[in-house]
């Protein structure tokens, strides 16, 4: 028997509402609720019930209705609600039968009972929506990350372990006494290009764009912003000494000519390898009244210090009191959890405001951003200043957005680590256990120079504030856009249209 879903009931209710609004009954005339309001209300109900496909359709219908009636503010609100629902639809594209078919095709030799064990939602992060179970677009990748026999067979077949093979020369190189903590500088020159087809853009209104740029840090020096184009539309820049690198532009859409709207950046910087040799006995005392100490030991949106997290931190460090040893204990605990690509859309859609540090604590799942936020939260819970840095990695062949973390030790400064890159040692098909341990040890307090830093910590707001609930504010690594006259959230186009190339010079 075919199940009657709630969307069928909603459809009937909408038809009734439309009949009443059209005056097709003999009821006394009253001030009607607009069809847009009805559609929006039912869309919100579907959204709250996790029926994201239905919610997306209803919000789009509401947007179209509001647009036709000239209510631009309501149309924009409906568009933004549709965007959040659509993010869920796009991140969860596969139903049960589809994901089973994909898993069988990708892992034909794995026993059926083992494959079935991967699919419960507490293992796969699946959701129930619109009467079906839907699976994350990253499900196949996560299966590989969670099963080292599969991952090592895969790297053996390729004859290469991503990240590990490229970075072993740094991790295994002996430190040079007296060379300092910032060594082996590499100068990089980068270009960024955002290209949006003109036919996607309306002819009126303004496209507001926040474009990422490099900033100065302890390891990233000599930052030069060579150009940002079109320069005539730049409204502000944060500068290279800020905590976040941004060029903000306002582009009149009436000025767009040709086949595409193009926004470009060009920049140069020098990145240093960071190498530390820390004597726990020489770690100084914190000045707990210092503004920087207070800043990096306080909670933020995604680095939360809940009672449960504080308890977890205490369980990890035990009776240890030395900040360095505590940070090391936290690092080794975090890298024991398998790398996992989560659904950021799910966290945004839930509207619960669940911090990423809590998501990792509760689920055990996290990617580079989530794990770095979790590490920072655990350190802060123990009175150790910590932060999560965002930007790009330029590891040859594996370039892309990336996040890692740092903790502060008096007498030494900011100590880097990269829990995600460290976990890559487990993927190696030919490394010994001793080599894996040596590699992980390197990334507990050192860092390679294949980095491009855009933001010094999680939750640093964009300047100016876009006041856009569809944007995740955890990290700023790719451009963000806001356009009140665009029929579709421009960030869908920006994600597809942004390209970065960074090369050694």
Segments predicted by a language model, with ranges:
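Low-complexity, Gly/Ser/Thr/Pro-rich intrinsically disordered linker/tail segments
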Residues: 439-505
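Intrinsically disordered, low-complexity N-terminal segments that are enriched in acidic
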Residues: 80-274
